[in-house]
UniProtKB/Swiss-Prot annotation:
Alphabetized Pfam families for the sequence: Acetyltransf_11 (PF13720), Hexapep (PF00132)
Molecular-function annotations in GO: acyl-[acyl-carrier-protein]-UDP-N-acetylglucosamine O-acyltransferase activity
Known role: Involved in the biosynthesis of lipid A, a phosphorylated glycolipid that anchors the lipopolysaccharide to the outer membrane of the cell.
UniProt-annotated location(s): Cytoplasm
Gene: lpxA
HAMAP family reported in the protein's UniProt record: LpxA
Source organism of this protein record: Enterobacter sp. (strain 638)
Keywords, sorted A to Z: Acyltransferase, Cytoplasm, Lipid A biosynthesis, Lipid biosynthesis, Lipid metabolism, Repeat, Transferase
One GO biological process term: lipid A biosynthetic process
Name of protein: Acyl-[acyl-carrier-protein]--UDP-N-acetylglucosamine O-acyltransferase
CDD domains attached to this UniProt entry: LbH_UDP-GlcNAc_AT
Catalysed reactions listed for this entry: a (3R)-hydroxyacyl-[ACP] + UDP-N-acetyl-alpha-D-glucosamine = a UDP-3-O-[(3R)-3-hydroxyacyl]-N-acetyl-alpha-D-glucosamine + holo-[ACP]
């Protein structure tokens, strides 16, 4: 079903069964598969391919040569009808690839809203990306990676499968991330190691001076006290009782499966 207010360029191919929302724009030489839903106001610039059981929300901008919802690169994939869901107001730049999920990973790759994925960024099968994140040019997420809100991943950085990137994290360019990166942390290198708290990012997002100080104190307990993480955890938990922002650390401890970067 194509809304009467949607624009479909004469050279675009929209297969029967696709749903195109009001005021959507499907540019020249785009291909939209039969199980795709494209929301109101979303723009496919040109030469964009959207395939599979893919739902794209409102007011997204998808640039030329992006491949969205294509078959994943997991060798176990046998053609199951897995899915990709993308939220609203994302900017997906040239040649970005976002693959649909696998049965083994829950069958869903999911992207939130208000993200920027720069040129050649890759989001593999079964990833979960939150909202207001940035993946810089050529940043790569392997399968099953989770990226929490407001995270920034630098150019040419690769994140190992099943890793978790916490909220407000900033990872420098050309890094290799093989373990989980806790919230608020700046990380860099191959293998990525912590370099402090993302203070400037927290200021920009309205964190108070008191909250930032508490986060820094928790970071020091984890990384600068000479204690093991297990030894530091009770003290971080005690700090979290006084400062709600620190609870992000204690909650992250429970989620982590690959261990924290050290």
């Amino acid at each position: 079903m194509i809304d009467k207010t949607a624009f479909i360029h004469p050279t675009a191919i929209v297969e029967e069964g696709a749903v195109i929302g009001a005021n959507a724009h499907i540019g020249p030489f785009c291909i939209v598969g039969p199980h795709v839903v494209i929301g109101e106001g979303t723009v496919l610039k040109s030469h964009v391919v959207v395939n599979g059981h893919t739902i794209i929300g409102r007011d997204n901008e998808i640039y030329q040569f992006a491949s969205i919802g294509e078959v994943n690169q997991d060798l176990k994939y046998a053609g199951e009808p897995t899915r990709l869901e993308i939220g609203d107001r994302n900017r997906i730049r040239e040649s970005v690839t976002i693959h649909r999920g696998t049965v083994q990973g829950g069958g869903l790759t999911k992207v939130g809203s208000d993200n920027l994925f720069m040129v050649n960024a890759h989001i593999a099968h079964d990833c979960t990306v939150g909202s207001r994140c940035i993946l810089a040019n050529n940043a790569t997420l392997a399968g099953h990676v989770s990226v929490d809100d407001f995270a920034i991943i630098g150019g040419m950085t690769a994140v190992h499968q099943f890793c978790i990137i916490g909220a407000h994290v900033m990872i420098g360019g050309c890094s290799g991330v093989a373990q989980d990166v806790p919230p608020y942390v700046i990380a860099q290198g191959n293998h990525a190691t912590p370099f402090g708290v993302n203070i400037e990012g927290l200021k920009r997002r309205g964190f108070s001076r008191e909250a930032i100080t508490a986060i820094r104190n928790a970071y020091k307990l984890m990384y600068r006290s000479g204690k093991t993480l297990e030894e530091a955890k009770p003290e971080v938990a005690a700090l979290a009782e006084q400062h709600p922002e620190v609870k992000a650390f204690t909650e992250f401890f429970e989620r982590s499966t690959r261990g924290l970067i050290r």
